[in-house]
Amino acid sequence: VPDEYFECFLEELPFSVPGPPCTDEHVRAYTGLVPDCLIAYWQEFGFSGFGNGVAWLVDPLEWKVTTEEVLLDAIQHPRLGEGAQYIPFARGAFGKTFFWTPGYGISLTVEPARGTVFFWAPPKGIERAMQSFFTASGKEQFDFFDRNEKPMFDRVHEHLGSLQFDEVYGFSPGLRIGGASNVDSAHLFQIHVHMAFLRTAIGDDWYVLG
């Protein structure tokens, strides 16, 4: 049974798309690095989609290469040293990804479609930081907003259908190379391939927020 914090999340974004299960390897690799509550969520729900797939729990083992060699190859939180570890734990349907750093808390939000990175300030209480994230997370946290600030998930979901755990909605051409954020430009992509494509388009020009 999920804790009261994740229950709040599920009320907003119900369990929708089953993903791969959490294994003993995940538990061994990440116990002590991420909060116990996150491992409990993995064990109960696996790396699955919520709210029709607008939000996902991320498998950090499966994302290891994409995290270290693709997305974060040139990103370092200004408050953290070179050896800081960034563990992806949640993502949106359009690829926005949230990272946890052991001993710090939630550290980064990366939105590759736009080429933006947000550096989080340290939380007031690290022991509740992960639970607070899920309690406060609604659909808008994971959605993508077009140039008119209108949320796109429902329209794209209706147009393309549901995502699987290793898929992402993206735009072709990409936004950083002149593409438009509209439903007709949206496509389904294999997530790691698309992340690598977006990273190439960003080059050295990440937009820093926060």
Question: Where do the PLM segments sit?
Answer:
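Noncatalytic linker/hinge segments flanking ATPase motor cores
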Residues: 79-81, 95-102, 128-141, 150-153
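Compact, glycine/acidic-enriched structural inserts
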Residues: 107-147
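A surface-exposed partner-binding patch
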Residues: 1-106, 163-210
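Mixed-charge (acidic/basic) macromolecular-recognition segments
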Residues: 133-185
